[in-house]
């Protein structure tokens, strides 16, 4: 889902990167990341993910597939963590540029590197992000939007 693009961009930067998850390309990614400050954490359960993502400066979603509504974006935002997401599928609809994160061109290592640097230099209001995301994605808010569709409002 864009792991190679992320690793290639991160190799050129002085920041520590922690990657959660795994898959059939993991060995290839580890080879690509050799000699860098990139740590592969493997699969994690939600309590660990919540702690890791909640403490992160920001989360990167380097998707190269058209995902309609990736939960990883919503989860990070609800934890107060800004998201740097690929401009593909439904991701741009979930990220308010400069407020809840930033976007980069999917599969574009140069743009991703530039946006990672921008994310580190940008100041986000983490508490406001968490609060607005929790309100936006709460059960009550979802129910109200669904009822508005049914009633034609």
State the predicted function of each range.
Residues 1-12, 24-27, 110:
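A conserved mid-protein helix/loop that constitutes part of the nucleotide-sugar donor-binding site
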Residues 27-47, 51:
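Nucleotide-activated donor-binding/catalytic signature segment of Leloir-type glycosyltransferases, i.e.
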Residues 54-68, 81:
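Acidic donor-binding loop of glycosyltransferase active sites
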Residues 64, 81, 85-92, 106-107:
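Short glycine-rich donor-binding/catalytic loop of glycosyltransferases
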Residues 73-74, 88-98, 102-103:
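Short acidic/histidine- and often glycine-rich active-site loop of Leloir-type glycosyltransferases
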Residues 97-98, 102-109, 117-123:
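Conserved acidic donor-binding segment of nucleotide-sugar-dependent glycosyltransferases
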Residues 121-151:
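A charged, aromatic-enriched C-terminal amphipathic alpha-helix characteristic of glycosyltransferases
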């Amino acid at each position: 889902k864009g792991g190679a693009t992320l690793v290639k961009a991160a190799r050129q930067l002085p920041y520590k990167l922690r990657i959660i998850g795994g898959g059939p390309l993991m060995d290839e990614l580890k080879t690509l990341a050799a000699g860098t400050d990139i740590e592969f954490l493997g699969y994690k359960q939600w309590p660990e993910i919540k702690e890791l993502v909640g403490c992160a400066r920001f989360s990167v979603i380097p998707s190269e597939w058209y995902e309609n509504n990736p939960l990883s974006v919503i989860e990070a935002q609800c934890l107060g963590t800004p998201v740097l997401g690929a401009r593909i599928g439904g991701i741009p609809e979930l990220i308010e540029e400069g407020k809840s994160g930033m976007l980069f061109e999917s599969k574009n290592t140069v743009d991703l590197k530039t946006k990672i640097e921008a994310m580190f230099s940008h100041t986000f209001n983490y508490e406001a992000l968490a609060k607005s995301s929790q309100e936006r994605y709460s059960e009550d808010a979802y129910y109200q939007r669904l009822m508005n569709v049914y009633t034609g409002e």
